[in-house]
């Protein structure tokens, strides 16, 4: 029975691998005439309203922060949005890139511990948000389609206000792409349904005939620096914070409860 389960798992993985391979196009076919490339830490490709992000091969295994804010719209100005946060970029199989958020309640602090391999096998983390690779660049960078995540999705970022109604997907558009030293940002104009009566006397709001208003949102992808025993805080200006987890590298017979207090000065 156990052998049958193992065989089924292998066949499932092989099927996923073959399916991923079939969807990957040669770069010459992907980079069509009229496509625009924006260089940077994460190169971006734009063509016919579609947006693609390249993940260089050397960044697989690195961590990235996905954050967002509402720039303007609905009488809101520079309001923070709920971002996905810190993710680890992984590629569990060829043709797939995942944004993983590992569960850190158990760790091995000693990176050279003999238990590292056994721990990684027994403490398998969920893959997270999966993205199919559409092509590989000449430098073997994985290129993924991110149009839906920016224009209509709520997996990367979201916001909730009682006066912001449902999204009108057909009107969404990317209005600005800005590469910077640590990553890239996307400014997106989304249109949402609105209560027209709420903005009858607002001088800053223009309600469209179909009952929708624009909302500008900026989503930022930032590559985080490599750091031994990475413990990421939401804001590095926080003077202290205590984290609790269990370490398996201090005692070969049992786990040890650890409390870390971040005392870095702002």
Q: Each predicted region: which residue ranges?
A:
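Hydrophobic h-region of N-terminal signal peptides that target proteins for export
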Residues: 11-19
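Auxiliary tRNA-acceptor-end handling modules of aminoacyl-tRNA synthetases
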Residues: 22-263
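Short, intrinsically disordered/low-complexity patches at protein termini
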Residues: 5, 16, 76-78
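Bacterial N-terminal signal peptides that target proteins for export
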Residues: 1-7
């Amino acid at each position: 029975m156990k052998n049958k389960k193992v065989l089924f798992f292998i066949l499932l993985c092989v099927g996923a691998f073959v399916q991923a391979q079939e969807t990957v196009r040669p770069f010459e076919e992907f980079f069509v005439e009229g496509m625009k490339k924006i260089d940077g830490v994460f190169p971006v490709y734009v063509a016919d309203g579609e947006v693609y992000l390249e993940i260089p091969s050397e960044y697989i295994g690195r961590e990235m922060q996905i954050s967002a804010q509402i720039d303007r719209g609905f009488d809101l100005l520079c309001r923070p949005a709920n971002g996905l946060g810190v993710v680890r970029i992984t590629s569990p199989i060829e043709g797939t890139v995942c944004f993983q958020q590992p569960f850190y309640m158990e760790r091995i602090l000693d990176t050279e511990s003999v238990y590292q391999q056994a721990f990684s096998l027994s403490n398998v983390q969920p893959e997270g948000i999966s993205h199919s690779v559409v092509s590989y660049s000449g430098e073997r960078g994985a290129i993924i389609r991110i149009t839906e995540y920016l224009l209509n999705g709520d997996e990367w970022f979201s916001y909730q206000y009682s006066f912001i109604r449902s999204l009108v997907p057909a009107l969404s558009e990317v209005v600005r792409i800005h590469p910077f030293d640590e990553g890239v940002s996307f400014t997106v104009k989304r249109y949402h349904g609105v209560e027209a009566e709420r903005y009858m006397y607002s001088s800053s709001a223009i309600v469209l005939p179909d009952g929708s208003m624009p909302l500008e949102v900026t989503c930022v992808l930032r590559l985080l620096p490599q750091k031994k025993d990475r413990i990421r805080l939401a804001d590095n200006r926080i003077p202290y914070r205590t984290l609790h987890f269990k370490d398996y590298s201090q005692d070969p017979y049992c786990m040890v409860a650890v409390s870390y207090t971040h005392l870095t000065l702002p």
